[in-house]
């Protein structure tokens, strides 16, 4: 497995792979890898000849400096996991390598609408940072496909739109959420939970599933469903942050024409902001 930290060396390797006619898959990550990331890697390996994993804690997508400062950096352990998975290339640049003049004056990519709605409304600048770094990685790696987890549902929708709008010739693959046996969606942020909070955490998925059951049973008073769900989360020890029921294909309000709904839930548990989602067929 090759570990590359600079843009010139990355470009050199990508040129070689292209000359050899290899099909390249990219898995963008911020490191602190868990089994959910490994599922992305496995999907990439099944679809391509060469797998490139990027590990970069992107300062542009953090709306709170304290979150950036405490985000776990576990590069050595991450590389050991990826080596066992027989990943071909790890791109692990420094912030200086990606943003040589800092983030404030760096050119950015913004996806109107999707960047500022829902999760974007409570995290100003977050999705602009995501679309900027992902587009830069697409330009550098020039992958045939790129794999992203469906846990970050809005992020995946944003990347799909960016790819369509910008004309990137890249297949975007959404990989289903990987869960612990108790239902908790795997996330790097789960590492912020205390042992006691970890016992409470599966309650998020239980509330999510309860909302899904109501929708599948034909209930359509969305405001009431959301209010009750928020109360249930708070009773379980969470601090409900945002609960939305949206059209799964547009992320707009559910209408009588909606065929699928996506339930998006975000809640604080101690210092960890946990998110999850579930798609429900409405027809």
Curated annotation (Swiss-Prot):
Keywords: ATP-binding, Cytoplasm, Ligase, Nucleotide-binding, Pantothenate biosynthesis
Enzyme class: ligase
Positions annotated to bind beta-alanine: 61
Protein location: Cytoplasm
BP-aspect Gene Ontology terms: pantothenate biosynthetic process
Recorded metabolic or biological pathway in which this protein acts: Cofactor biosynthesis; (R)-pantothenate biosynthesis; (R)-pantothenate from (R)-pantoate and beta-alanine: step 1/1
Listed GO MF terms: ATP binding; pantoate-beta-alanine ligase activity
Principal location: cytoplasm
Residues at which ATP binds: 30-37, 149-152, 186-189
Miscellaneous: The reaction proceeds by a bi uni uni bi ping pong mechanism.
Family affiliation: Belongs to the pantothenate synthetase family.
Job description of the protein: Catalyzes the condensation of pantoate with beta-alanine in an ATP-dependent reaction via a pantoyl-adenylate intermediate.
Protein's recorded name: Pantothenate synthetase
Source organism per UniProt: Escherichia coli O17:K52:H18 (strain UMN026 / ExPEC)
The encoding gene: panC
